[in-house]
Amino acid sequence: MNKAKEQVLEEYPDAKIFIIDTLRFGPGYGLMAIIASEMRKEGKDVEEVAKWLEDNKNRFHQTGWMDDLAFTAKKGRLTRAKAFMGTLVGIKPIGEFDKNGLTTVIGKLKGEKMAYSVLVDFIAETIIDADKQTIIIATTNRHKNAEEYKRLIEERFHPKKVMICDVFPFCGINIGPGLMAAYYYGKPISEGLEEEKALVARLSENYKG
């Protein structure tokens, strides 16, 4: 990244360039770019925007599920037997970014109805100023689920905008089909995702039985 900066400065020596490791992929840093653009339109200078992004990058959440575990098994992250049984009974691992930018499982929910309910409740407890936000929903071949997730989010939070996008191939090849996740700005992500794991466990109790 520093090399790229140096090359640009050779041709445009007066350019202001800031390097930020977003610790996010695809829709995550796409959302950061949207917010940065909005801040510039509000009159904030590039230094202020860059500092805000650096200071707040661990407030960008990824909340969603994987419902096809076969690809996870192929990547060696789960045994084939567990992947088969999990998919068969409708187990949906719930993922979130940790403080290092790695997608980490924070809970496992059974069935779409429960998963939708817990995900929307999770967003409610972690998002900030939902009505002022643009929320991005990313998917790999689960557009029907993404549309339902969008409907539930719009009904609950009335955000400024909800966008649905496909995960591009570079990331999708490492994820496989079955991903559906919302990206938004919220409370700081906790160390080791301990608070987020506890939150999913607590919320899931409301829908058991």
Labelled PLM ranges:
Residues 1-18, 24-34, 38-209:
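Mixed-charge interfacial surface used for oligomerization/domain docking
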